[in-house]
Design a protein with these regions (language model features):
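Solvent-exposed alpha-helical segments within well-ordered globular domains of core cellular machineries
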Residues: 3, 7, 24, 85, ...
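Hydrophobic, helix-rich cores of sensory/ligand-binding and other regulatory modules
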Residues: 107-110
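Bateman/CBS regulatory modules and CBS-like beta-alpha motifs in cytosolic regions of diverse proteins
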Residues: 1-25, 36-38, 43-44, 48, ...
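Short acidic/polar active-site loop segments enriched in Thr and Asp
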Residues: 32, 93, 154
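N-terminal, positively charged regions that mediate nucleic acid binding
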Residues: 26-30
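Short beta-strand/turn micro-motifs at beta-sheet edges
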Residues: 116-121
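A conserved regulatory-domain signal marking ACT and ACT-like small-molecule sensing domains
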Residues: 126-218
Length: 218
């Protein structure tokens, strides 16, 4: 999940704030997008730097630019790889994060994402991500690793999320035929809850993933 990388250091503007002040916020934080909220801190939309610069009068309030704001955000319990899809699809410098009531809670940026997944120096050919949900007492990494390696896969990195009596294990794998690995794990009664792939044929995550990582590594 993205909860643990949410930043809250940005003073987000409201609709009645003047656009010129938003440019100063962007410069301070080295970003080209800023979330806009209403008086109740409800997320309105994301405004970009170019839209503000192209205003007829940047002294005007942001409310005059409401039609230019993009309704792009993630909820705080979203998976980290949904953030990669969002960043790469919309070429964003930050992603606004909201709660279940659409209240703005913070943002994440590109660097936060890559540091979270710990893949900054990885070869992304044949990279796949699988998420296994299981009870803590059933978690034996050596067995999972054995099943993966027996099917010509390799664990590049992993991280874990613990909720109550369960643990979600996120595995970054190098494998050509990840579907075989998934079927093997399921045959051993492992619950695969999510899958992501750098393969452009995947419906979940395409070659924008590799482009995004390569961009961050330049």
């Amino acid at each position: 999940m993205i909860k643990d990388i949410i930043k809250r250091d940005l003073s987000v503007p409201k609709l009645n704030d003047s656009a010129i002040n938003i440019l100063a916020v962007m410069e301070e934080h080295k970003i080209s997008h800023v979330p806009v909220v209403d008086e109740n801190n409800k997320f309105i939309g994301l405004i970009d730097e170019l839209s503000i610069i192209n205003m007829n009068n940047i002294q005007h309030p942001l409310s005059s630019m409401k039609k230019n704001m993009k309704n792009i955000f993630l909820v705080e319990n979203a998976h980290i790889f949904q953030s990669i899809q969002t960043v790469t699809s919309h070429l964003l410098s930050i992603i606004p994060i909201v709660d279940e009531n659409h209240i703005y809670v913070g943002y994440i940026n590109q660097l936060d994402i890559i540091q979270k997944i710990g893949l900054s120096h990885t070869n992304y050919d044949n990279l796949n991500i699988i998420v296994i949900s299981l009870h803590k007492k059933d978690y034996v990494l050596s067995e999972i690793s054995r099943l993966i390696e027996e099917n010509n896969g390799k664990i590049i990195t992993l991280w874990q999320e613990i909720t109550n009596d369960k643990i979600n294990v996120h595995l970054a794998l190098s494998c050509i035929k990840c579907d075989i690995i998934i079927k093997t794990l399921e045959r051993y009664e492992y619950n695969i809850t999510q899958t992501f792939s750098s393969d452009y044929t995947s419906n979940a995550l395409d070659d924008r993933f590799e482009s995004f990582i390569n961009y961050l590594n330049t």
